[in-house]
Amino acid sequence: MSRQVVRSSKFRHVFGQPAKADQCYEDVRVSQTTWDSGFCAVNPKFVALICEASGGGAFLVLPLGKTGRVDKNAPTVCGHTAPVLDIAWCPHNDNVIASGSEDCTVMVWEIPDGGLMLPLREPVVTLEGHTKRVGIVAWHTTAQNVLLSAGCDNVIMVWDVGTGAAMLTLGPEVHPDTIYSVDWSRDGGLICTSCRDKRVRIIEPRKGTVVAEKDRPHEGTRPVRAVFVSEGKILTTGFSRMSERQVALWDTKHLEEPLSLQELDTSSGVLLPFFDPDTNIVYLCGKGDSSIRYFEITSEAPFLHYLSMFSSKESQRGMGYMPKRGLEVNKCEIARFYKLHERRCEPIAMTVPRKSDLFQEDLYPPTAGPDPALTAEEWLGGRDAGPLLISLKDGYVPPKSRELRVNRGLDTGRRRAAPEASGTPSSDAVSRLEEEMRKLQATVQELQKRLDRLEETVQAK
């Protein structure tokens, strides 16, 4: 009698652990807008989530450790004039976040260490060029100040945030219909897109050329998502002709047939994929679902291996995914999600059970650090580079907020890009006002530090 051989994997027993109530963010008003983005973005310093706002669009930014009940009057980032659809933290500066909105603009914001004391209405730069709502913002993985945006005008724009100027535009001739998803390759040389015309495309954005494309990776009519995974492969999620949800793995050089195609269930929510290149695990989270499925990708058939599923009682309205440098390596945490409920944000830690408290080198290979590998000019000139890697053996401490190198460039770019209008203040007046605002922010931060020290003294007594 033959025995079934169980595949060996150190990730077979990964389990999800939701945070205790006092480690959640309570009483937050998550946006009711219908849009298939995660509505949440996190990094080692902050958690940001798109919230309900009257008279415009807003999102909430909280220091990661500021858990518990969130005051209903907590200051928000509220410069958009219509609902915010997508947010993304800069991978090279934990204090910088980009937002795309129904008001057709992309805005880039700087968040002070310690979080917001007052509502933030003025972005560092506003990027204008789309003619319809902007539903996707995505930072370049390794080049400094390079930001991509995709709008419902079927246009992708790549911006140099340091100048406020559009470097590249991929028009409707590339995508004739709504763009569902965009993902950068690990070295930032290619982008992978999915579109309402039922095609997945791999594009060299600097040349504007489609390197490869697949028509109907999934037969259903619902939206498809596509992301780069391990070397030379992409992963897609979509629906069958019978409306069953599917996940598929493809070789980018041979897109005729998938390496693996698995049917999951008959739920209607679009599956959002999150890929970890350090472990080759992909996590699938669906809006309206109450579960997170995870799979391991290997270089040998059958290539895509189901590991397990984390389930809870309440469905999710959105999901944020922590970069590897924000995890607790001493607890063997290999991923952390921030699940949005209707009035709450709940961290969920994905952990590999290990008996030893020592650093587990096999779980934590060198990972992408916060420093860019290229400048925007180098990338535009044709250079590609993988991320600069760091070790997590001694843990990761986020650096203190430093004056952004993009600030001066952003201000100049904003003045250069904006049309001259009668009655607008001079550049000298603008500079003086900005300097005063910086001084006021510094004063507020100093007063907050004094207040914190005073509270510590009172508690000690």
Curated annotation (Swiss-Prot):
A Gene Ontology annotation in the biological process aspect, one of them, is: T cell proliferation
**What tissues has this protein been observed in?**
Expressed in brain, thymus, spleen, bone marrow and lymph node. Low in lung and gut.
One Pfam assignment: WD40
Q: Which sections of the protein are WD repeats? A: 13-63, 73-110, 123-160, 164-204, 207-251, 258-296, 302-349
The keyword Cytoplasm belongs to this UniProt entry's keyword annotation: yes
- Point out residues bearing the modification N-acetylserine: 2
- Give a yes or no for keyword Membrane in this entry: yes
Q: Where is this region: Disordered?
A: 403-432
Q: Which residues carry this modification: Phosphothreonine?
A: 412
Substituting residue 134 to M results in: In IMD8; the mutation causes a decrease in protein stability; patient T-cell blasts show delayed activation of signaling molecules MAPK3 and MAPK1
- GO molecular function ontology, one term from the record: actin monomer binding
Can you list the GO cellular component terms from the UniProt entry?
Answer: actin filament; axon; cell-cell junction; cortical actin cytoskeleton; cytoplasm; cytosol; early endosome; extracellular exosome
Basic and acidic residues: bias regions: 403-418
- Localization (cell): Cytoplasm, Cytoskeleton; Cytoplasm, Cell cortex; Cytoplasmic vesicle, Phagosome membrane
Q: Which SUPFAM superfamilies match?
A: WD40 repeat-like
List, alphabetically, the SMART domains matched: DUF1899, DUF1900, WD40
Residue runs in coiled coils: 424-460
Mark the residues carrying the PTM N6-acetyllysine.
Answer: 449
What UniProt keywords are attached to this protein's entry?
Answer: Acetylation, Actin-binding, Coiled coil, Cytoplasm, Cytoplasmic vesicle, Cytoskeleton, Disease variant, Membrane, Phosphoprotein, Repeat, Ubl conjugation, WD repeat
Summarize the disease involvement recorded for this protein: Immunodeficiency 8 with lymphoproliferation: A disease of the immune system leading to recurrent infections, and characterized by CD4+ T-cells lymphopenia. Patients can develop B-cell lymphoproliferation associated with Epstein-Barr virus infection.
Q: Which family does it belong to?
A: Belongs to the WD repeat coronin family.
| Known function | May be a crucial component of the cytoskeleton of highly motile cells, functioning both in the invagination of large pieces of plasma membrane, as well as in forming protrusions of the plasma membrane involved in cell locomotion. In mycobacteria-infected cells, its retention on the phagosomal membrane prevents fusion between phagosomes and lysosomes.
Subunit notes for this chain? Binds actin.
What name is this protein filed under?
Coronin-1A
Q: Which organism is it from?
A: Homo sapiens
Q: Which gene encodes it?
A: CORO1A
